[in-house]
Amino acid sequence: MMLIPTHHFRDIERKPEYLQPEKCAPPPFPGPAGAMWFIRDGCGIACAIVTWFLVLYAEFVVLFVMLVPSRDYAYSIINGIVFNLLAFLALASHCRAMLTDPGAVPKGNATKEFIESLQLKPGQVVYKCPKCCSIKPDRAHHCSVCKRCIRKMDHHCPWVNNCVGENNQKYFVLFTMYIALISLHALIMVGFHFLHCFEEDWTKCSSFSPPTTVILLILLCFEALLFLIFTSVMFGTQVHSICTDETGIEQLKKEERRWAKKTKWMNMKAVFGHPFSLGWASPFATPDQGKADPYQYVV
């Protein structure tokens, strides 16, 4: 007897009650193009506010405790420009990482009509997420906080109140890089300022009282050291993940590699855009990644 090839529809959690595409409601009407993405999560919003507060605190101490009272105008101007530029780029990267759709799969598109429109060939399957009722592209994972399946999801970061995925990984990498740079810059300036205050009169090295100055500088030093270590490790982890073309979740789950292997340079260009330019370091440049839309899997 000859068997007729059939298409396959698989549920990611292998629950029989979810295997019927008719169980899904029709997908919601798409929102306007360019609509802002924002996750309403209390913990994430609180972490994002704390992030901005800490950067603005560092800005306050650097400007009004160290640079403004300094008699070396060249030192104050140069360091003020560098620190403010890095802080601006860090906060801009934070906003882009937080407000950019990380690559959410259309919700509720696992309908019978949509599956038939894919025109699957024999031997091909599609995977469905029972939680958001979406057809999962290859390398997509469901986020319990965003309540969506995210393409190439690396992890959900509460500090940016968003998932780090296919569309916003560049901005997250820039955010960690610029935070690490301003943390290092702040530590260096705190060290020089302490030396200056020890050599000079404490009452002349700051517009604040000596005890207040010491407390503000120690708090900034602790904050800068903590975030320098944290963001440097995160930056290195992200760059390694990009170069190996393997997300944090894929590494954690030890998922079998089903995608084509590319060079490290090609993987970097896939995240930061083609070709290499100063736009790689800009949170305002949107990378042209030329992404595909792979809903189908060959098994």
UniProtKB/Swiss-Prot annotation:
How the protein is affected by changing residue 129 to S?
Answer: No effect on ZDHHC3 palmitoylation. Changed protein structure. Decreased protein-cysteine S-palmitoyltransferase activity
Bilayer topology annotation? Multi-pass membrane protein
Q: What is the effect of changing residue 295 to F?
A: Decreased phosphorylation by SRC and increased autopalmitoylation
Record's superkingdom? Eukaryota
Cytoplasmic compartment spans: 1-47, 94-171, 236-299
Q: What is the effect of changing residue 157 to S?
A: Loss of protein-cysteine S-acyltransferase activity. Loss of ZDHHC3 palmitoylation
Deleted gene: phenotype: Homozygous knockout mice are viable, fertile and do not display overt phenotype. Male show a modest reduction in body weight. Zdhhc3 and Zdhhc7 double knockout mice show a perinatally lethal phenotype.
Q: Does the keyword Isomerase apply?
A: no
Any single GO CC term annotated in Swiss-Prot or TrEMBL for this entry: Golgi membrane
User: Membrane-crossing residues?
Assistant: 48-68, 73-93, 172-192, 215-235
What's its top-level EC category?
A: transferase
Task: Give the UniProt tissue specificity note.
Answer: Widely expressed, with highest levels in brain. In the brain, expressed only in neurons (at protein level).
Record domain DHHC: where: 126-177
Q: How is it modified after translation?
A: Phosphorylation by FGFR1 and SRC probably regulates the palmitoyltransferase activity. Autopalmitoylated.
Query: Which residues lie toward the Lumenal compartment?
Result: 69-72, 193-214
Write out the catalytic residues in the record: 157 (s-palmitoyl cysteine intermediate)
Entry keyword set = Acyltransferase, Golgi apparatus, Lipoprotein, Membrane, Palmitate, Phosphoprotein, Transferase, Transmembrane, Transmembrane helix
One Gene Ontology term from the biological process aspect of the record? peptidyl-L-cysteine S-palmitoylation
Instruction: Please state where this protein is localized.
Output: Golgi apparatus membrane
Q: Which residues carry this modification: Phosphotyrosine?
A: 18
List, alphabetically, the Pfam families matched: DHHC
* Positions where lipid (S-palmitoyl cysteine) attaches: 146
The family annotation for this protein states: Belongs to the DHHC palmitoyltransferase family.
Domain comment in the entry: The DHHC domain is required for palmitoyltransferase activity.
Fill in the subunit field for this protein.
Answer: Monomer. Homooligomers. The monomeric form has a higher catalytic activity. Forms heterooligomers with ZDHHC7. Interacts with TNFRSF10A.
Give the protein name, as stated in the record: Palmitoyltransferase ZDHHC3
Source organism of this protein record? Mus musculus
